[in-house]
């Protein structure tokens, strides 16, 4: 039995999946004789523990060298009217005693070679240092977003107003080709008076104080200007930038265990795709939590119908509050009731609508899939990149507006939809039709598809024996041994 590397995941399926993929990479490259992996995760009011527990059971069964340690349940004590992000950040801080206890207990029986934390788990950084454990960040988005976060303490100095009030004022980030509107900043920093704002400033200011930053991307995907800005210290002008290791793309390609009903629907979906012409189907899916109110679902349906294109569309139950863009769980609902009357019947010969979930990694790799409408969550972006599928970028929350900017302007692997710059981010049916036709019918769409195919090949090469991500990963391991 080798030494252990402890990973600490932020709440949320996307964060845990990314951490697990990093753990799988370490075990795959070096085996349990050198390193075992222990993943710490939280339990409480902000966590969808049911779906996470099912996922963890699957990973524990298939990867016995990866163990999980669930913290005792924590309940938020905050009752003030603050944002969901502020509530989550407070929830994570309340787990600090559990982090300290876990590291203390693990260290008694085995050497902890490294402690790797999510950005949102920054309050654990001094705990790792307290135990003299080399402490690294695992940044689960791309290099451009990392550049922005590293630079954000300097942006904070440029204004005393809330970004949500500055709206169309633009801000420049080192290495970025185009500036970002204030209203499109990452959600937790929009309101300067919300506690989440100061939390984010703190998180970003602590990034350079780590032993290094591991990033789930690969060099060939990112703009050379962004990579140079980070490496050259432009993002942290007042101090040293720690080593940055680009080790991706890390994605979960294992088949999920489904119940009988889900398995049957999955089989129908994949069988339908197999019958469609090459690169003819547009896949629409907005992540594990992305959801739309009924009025927006109807606009999407109208746009798809008017476009005349083949499509596979994953529809989630509309949120209770119209302006909310996230749902938790997969509650049943009346599909016909949230779509235009007769839509399913009129498009039955060229479209398929499934409720709540589809095997996204498998779908994107199908020969018939020629485009992907995505919320720009980084895991989904990487899955499309690896599959060589171009995207229509439709951001909903978190850092997704940042990702949209970069995908469209810097990486040139996506087309952006025009959204209303209000809280609901509304997109008209006419805009849906326009962008779908642009991607699936135009010469520009064909060029984009060819470019994405080449980048997909680069993604695989990056993970090869002599690839850039493999080289960077070896450098990371060398830093802890």
Curated annotation (Swiss-Prot):
EC number(s) on file: 2.4.1.-
Alphabetized GO MF terms: UDP-glucosyltransferase activity
InterPro entries per the UniProt record, alphabetical: UDP-glycosyltransf_plant (IPR050481), UDP_glucos_trans (IPR002213), UDP_glycos_trans_CS (IPR035595)
Annotated residues for binding of UDP-alpha-D-glucose: 288, 357-358, 375-383, 397-400
EC class name: transferase
Keyword Metal-binding on entry: no
This protein's UniProt keywords: Glycosyltransferase, Transferase
A Pfam family annotated for this UniProt entry: UDPGT
Role, per record: Glycosyltransferase that may possess chalcone and dihydrochalcone 2'-O-glucosyltransferase activity.
Similarity section: Belongs to the UDP-glycosyltransferase family.
Protein name: UDP-glycosyltransferase 88F4
Native species: Malus domestica (Apple)
């Amino acid at each position: 039995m080798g030494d252990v590397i402890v990973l600490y995941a932020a709440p949320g399926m996307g964060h845990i999946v990314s951490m697990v993929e990093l753990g799988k990479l370490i075990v795959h490259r070096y085996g349990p004789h050198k390193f075992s992996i222990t993943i710490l995760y939280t339990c409480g009011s902000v966590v969808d523990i049911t779906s996470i527990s099912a996922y963890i059971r699957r990973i524990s069964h298939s990867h016995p060298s990866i163990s999980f340690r669930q913290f005792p349940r924590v309940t938020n004590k905050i009752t003030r009217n603050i944002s969901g992000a502020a509530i989550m950040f407070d929830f994570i801080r309340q787990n600090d005693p559990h982090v300290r206890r876990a590291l203390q207990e693990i260290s008694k029986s085995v050497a902890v070679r490294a402690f790797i934390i999510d950005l949102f788990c920054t309050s654990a950084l001094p705990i790792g240092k307290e135990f003299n454990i080399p402490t690294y960040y695992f940044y689960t988005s791309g290099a451009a977003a990392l550049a922005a976060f590293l630079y954000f303490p300097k942006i904070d100095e440029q204004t005393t107003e809330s970004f949500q009030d500055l709206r169309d004022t633009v801000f420049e980030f080192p290495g970025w080709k185009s500036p970002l509107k204030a209203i499109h900043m990452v959600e937790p920093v929009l309101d300067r008076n919300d506690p989440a704002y100061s939390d984010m400033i703190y998180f970003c200011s602590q990034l350079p104080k780590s032993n290094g930053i591991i990033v789930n991307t690969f060099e060939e995907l990112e703009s050379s200007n962004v990579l140079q800005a980070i490496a050259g210290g432009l993002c942290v002008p007042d101090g040293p930038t720690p080593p940055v290791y680009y080790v991706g793309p890390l994605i979960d390609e294992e088949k999920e265990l489904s119940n009988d009903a889900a398995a049957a629907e999955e089989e129908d979906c994949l069988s339908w795709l197999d019958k469609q012409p090459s690169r003819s189907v547009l896949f629409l899916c907005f992540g594990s939590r992305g959801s739309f109110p009924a009025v927006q679902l109807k606009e999407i349906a109208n746009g798809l119908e008017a476009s005349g294109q083949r499509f596979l569309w994953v529809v989630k139950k509309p949120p209770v509050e119209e302006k909310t863009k996230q749902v938790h769980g997969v509650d049943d609902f009346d599909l016909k009731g949230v779509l235009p009357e007769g839509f399913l019947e009129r498009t039955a010969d060229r479209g398929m609508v499934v409720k709540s979930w589809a095997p996204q990694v498998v779908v994107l790799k199908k020969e018939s899939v020629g485009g992907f409408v995505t919320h720009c969550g980084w895991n989904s972006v990487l899955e499309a990149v690896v599959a060589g599928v171009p995207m229509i970028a439709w951001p909903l929350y978190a850092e997704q507006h940042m990702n949209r900017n970069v995908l469209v302007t810097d990486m040139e692997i996506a087309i952006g939809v025009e959204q209303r710059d209000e809280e609901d981010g509304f997109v008209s049916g006419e805009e849906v039709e326009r962008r779908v036709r642009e991607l699936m019918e135009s010469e520009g769409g064909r060029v984009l598809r060819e470019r994405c195919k080449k980048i997909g090949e680069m993604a695989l090469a990056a993970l090869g024996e002599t690839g850039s991500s493999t080289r960077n990963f070896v450098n990371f391991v060398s830093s802890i041994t």
